Structures are given as C-alpha cells and as structure tokens.
Amino acid sequence: LDPGTPLFLEARYLLAEEVTALREASIYHSVLAAVAAGNNTRGGIASHVGRKASDLTHYLNVWEDTGLLVREEDVFRSGRSRYRIAEPLISFYEVVSRPQWGRLEAGHAETVWADAKARFAAQVLGPHFETLCRRWAQLVAADMFGALPGEVGAGVIADAANRTQIQVDVAVFAPAERSGPRRILSLGEAKWGKTMTLAHIDRLRRAAHLLEGRGYDTSTTRLTCYSGTGFDEDIRAAAARDARIHLIELADLYVPVDGSR
C-alpha cells in the first residue's frame, strides 16, 4: 500500500498489459471486480456488472485465455461452474487498492487498510486459503484419505428438507472406476479466520448423507476441516474419538506430502 514501493503499481501494470488493446476495457475491469467481490457465478457476475449473463461470455472467455480468471466446475452439479481470480495480487488490488486509489496515492495507507481488513480476509485470504487446501488434498499420500485422490474440487449440495445449500470447499474423489458408485474419499470445509466447531462437522456429515442418497459411495468418507485459525475443544475431542474426522491446520499444509506425516 506504500506508493513508494514497486509492488504498489504492479497489479495496475499487469492489468494494463492485458486490456490496453481491448475495446470496452471498463467492462473487463468490472468483471474482475465482480469476481473479487465474491460474485463467482456467471449470474452473480452479470448482476454485479449490470449486464445479461449471455452478454458477458466474451469478456469471461478473454480473461480465461489470459490465465487471470479460472473457471472451476461444480463437482456435484453438472453444467454449473464458478470463477476465481488466479493471481492473489490482482484480488488484493481489486478489493483493497483500487477502490481507494486516490487516498493511497495521498499517503493514507493506514486509513485505507483499517477500512479494508475485513474485506481482505473474506474476499482475498478466504478464497485463496480454499484453493491452497484443494491443492494440498490433491497431493496427499494414500493413507490420509484411504486412497490416492483422483479428482479434487468444490461444489454445492442442495438440502431441500432444510431449504438450504451446503458448500463443500474441498471434495476429494477416488480415481474413477469402470463400475459401481463414485466413491468420495473426503468432504471438507475450509475457514481462514474462524475457529471451527462441531457445527462444521455436522454440516459435512449432512452433506455425506445427502450425497449417499444421490448414489455416491460415502461409506468411508472422511470429514475434514481446514482452518487457518484453529479448532475448539469439542471438535478436537471428536476427532480424537473418530478416525474419520480430520483436522488440518495451517502448518499441516506446508508439511511434505510424501506420506511422512
């Protein structure tokens, strides 16, 4: 946030390189701002930008081609996807710097940061932490979830009985087999700035039950909580009693994933 450092302008330079030759540059910037603000579905982006979803196909495709925007399929809902910004520096710029650029240039970084800290945690750190957890889960040894992971992703499960939806941040599937139901090795929830409790395990257990009803094999599914803050005593006690409950802390994500845990 210091105008005197090279990194202060880096995000603006990166974006300028990508959109200088493009028409309607403001729309491209608006699309990125929408995703950075947490609108990660096509409909959500369209609502934020004030355009029809069909009108944004070209802009989304261009950002995907540059590699700055990544489209990830919902692993539980065919044809549904969500977008994320691939470069955390761009997310930081859109969430923290760009809205208060004038104040930053005037040297009021402390004021800007005080106002932006909560948004930074929710819209930059949170999504990036989820991505790190999925990358970690993709590389773990077979003894973590009972088999080497196949596909790893995220998805939403409709809970009609409770009139809600359950977001699964880290869904780990066994490698595809020729026959039989698709086996889920782990269902996980990731929280950067919140102490996790038994409520998070209960939600994952409910998700496993719903998926079993949809034909998935959840007989050996691990329920995994990933936290950047920690876990309360009750959930730690539950994990000590039940080997199918895994608690992954920030330090665990940086342990070599070669099975030497």
Each PLM stretch: what is its role?
Residues L1-Q167:
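Accessory nucleic acid-recognition modules appended to NTPase machines
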Residues A137, I166-A176, P181-K194, L204-R206, ...:
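Conserved catalytic cores of phosphodiester-cleaving nucleases, focusing on short active-site segments
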Residues G153-N162, L187-I201:
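Acidic/glycine-enriched edge-of-secondary-structure segments
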Residues I166, A199-R203, I235:
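Residues at alpha-helix caps and immediate loop-helix transition turns in enzyme cores, especially N-
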